[in-house]
């Protein structure tokens, strides 16, 4: 059972009703697998519903039904997918202890059923959660454990996930050079060992690095073109197109930028990428070209970490140099504050771990 054993009576009734309703879909055995996840077609609608409700308590009930029906049909992959839902739910609730349990449960069934991609999905989900919580030291430590296991398994997807995750971690810590090294290593590993996978996101990440950090726009544009050629989904094509817009803007190729921007915005709307940081910066670039500085500032307000930097750039383009200097100073103060908080977070995490280890030793000696 995927839902906690201490459920309320109401939850038990809901679970039974959910089971009865959804069982209609899987009343007849089916071996067809004409869906993206290659699970039994009778189970796929249940998974879709569970996935859509993954942030709600009801999602746990649907996941429980999915698991029970997957057991009946002997679909081991669907059983693993059912265990992903509780992990997603508890991550949305920011419940560390239940996240740990849900992750462990997913790892165990994935290994038992020989679907190791979901074993490493559990690791990656935990790591990204801790990164979003500004607990990058813990994320880094978990990534190291994940790496050891991936190499022990000799599992290409696991090894690739570890390398890419290290890139995410160092990017979140502001070490963009080391992050890019890991992204390049992950890309090389994917192209060699997983040629059927989509490398476009890594190409786009490297394009961003060369655009932002190295100011090497020719190399950045080359990575954008590779991303566009290799992308297998419209969403990844849109992300690569947005990055290409930003490079063209920096190169001063305005006519090409305008054409690229128009196409990128249309694709982003279809893929619901409105909150994308890169897209917001592309909007700001277009506003600056059209001298729509108020709209540019409104877009910059939607950015968290890069907002102050963009405000400074907009004021500079508008030739309002006093405000440009003012916001640039604020941006650098924000960077210093973020770095200090990161160090304090690392120290707090270390102290917690040392305290836990000391308590273990005291219990052993007692």
Predicted feature locations:
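N-terminal leader/linker segments that initiate helical-solenoid repeat arrays
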Residues: 30-84
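Hydrophobic positions within repeat-based interaction scaffolds
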Residues: 37-44, 301-366
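Residue register of alpha-helical TPR repeats
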Residues: 41, 81, 121-122, 161, ...
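"A position-specific structural signal for the A-helix of alpha-solenoid helical repeats
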Residues: 45, 85, 125, 158, ...
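Residue-level recognition of tetratricopeptide repeat
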Residues: 48, 88, 128, 168, ...
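Structural motif corresponding to the intra-repeat A-B loop/turn of tetratricopeptide repeats
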Residues: 53, 73, 93, 113, ...
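Amphipathic alpha-helical segments of tetratricopeptide repeats
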Residues: 64-68, 104-111, 144-151, 185-191, ...
